[in-house]
Each structure stands twice: as structure tokens, then as C-alpha cells.
Amino acid sequence: MKPRMLPLLVVVVFLAIPSWAAERQRIQLLVPADKLAEVRALTSPLPNSPETAAQGKAIYDGKGACFRCHGKDGNGNGPLAARLNPSPRNFKDHGFWSQRTEGEVFWLIKNGSPGTGIVGYGDQLTDGEIWAIIQYLRSFTGEHGPP
């Protein structure tokens, strides 16, 4: 490496750290620590199928109105996204599913997450509807059901 490149490299790394830290913050645990083991063990009672994902899509686009924040394509750019801080989750991000269990996502949809735009939908959606939405969310990365 040329000596003149070192200052440039330092500047690039320095500027990248806040972006990396912001993304790490978005992946932080949102389920209370005393419930985490129980929540991570939750699994969907629904069949892992394209039909279940289609049911989830209908709820995502309709009754659940998830698209308003997360976008029609699940990339976090729905019509209300610009008003939210932090930004809505991008479900096309493969890294998200490697760091969250379906049980955690179920709990967050049902109970909400303070400090984010997601309110609890447990009084509006049945458990089955929430599980169907989760299967649809997985389809954004080409997956169905748990890994």
C-alpha cells in the first residue's frame, strides 16, 4: 500500500463506523431478556407451504397493513417509512433472518417494540395470521419457513 493511501483508508473506515453501528443497533434484541428463551423456542403451527405464504401476503397487504411501513416488496420503503425513525425493517436483508428466530419476530408483531414504529398487533391479528405473515416475510429472501 502506498503511504499516501493510508490517510484515505483511515478516513473511509472512520466514516463507515457510524453506518455499521446503526445497523448493529437495528439488530439488537427487542424481546425482554426474561422472555427470550421462551420466545426463541416458539415455532409456527402452520404448514410450511406456498399456500401459507399466500395467506400471509393477503394479510400483509390487507388487514395487517404491513406494506404501509415495510413496502409492497418488504424492503422497508412503504408510504409511511419516511416518517419513521428508526426506519422499518428490510425483510429482503438475508442477515436479518440469520439473527432472529421466527419466535422473536412473532413476539414483536404480537407485542410491538418500544422505540420503533411497530405497535403490537396481538389484538388485531390472530396467532395464525401472524405466523402466516412471518412465512410470507421469509419469501422476500426466497425462503419458506425456518432455515
Regions found by a protein language model. Name each.
Residues 1-7:
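Bacterial N-terminal signal peptides that target proteins for export
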Residues 7-16:
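Bacterial N-terminal signal peptides
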Residues 17-21:
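Sec/Tat signal peptide C-region and signal peptidase I cleavage site
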Residues 29-61, 147:
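Electrostatic cytochrome c docking/interface patches
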Residues 51-72, 81:
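Sequence/structural segment immediately N-terminal to covalent heme-attachment motifs in c-type
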Residues 57, 72-102, 106:
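Gly/Gly-Pro-rich "capping" loops immediately C-terminal to redox-active cysteine motifs
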Residues 69-76, 110-111, 138:
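Detector for the c-type heme attachment site
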Residues 107-114, 121-147:
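C-terminal capping alpha-helices of c-type cytochrome domains
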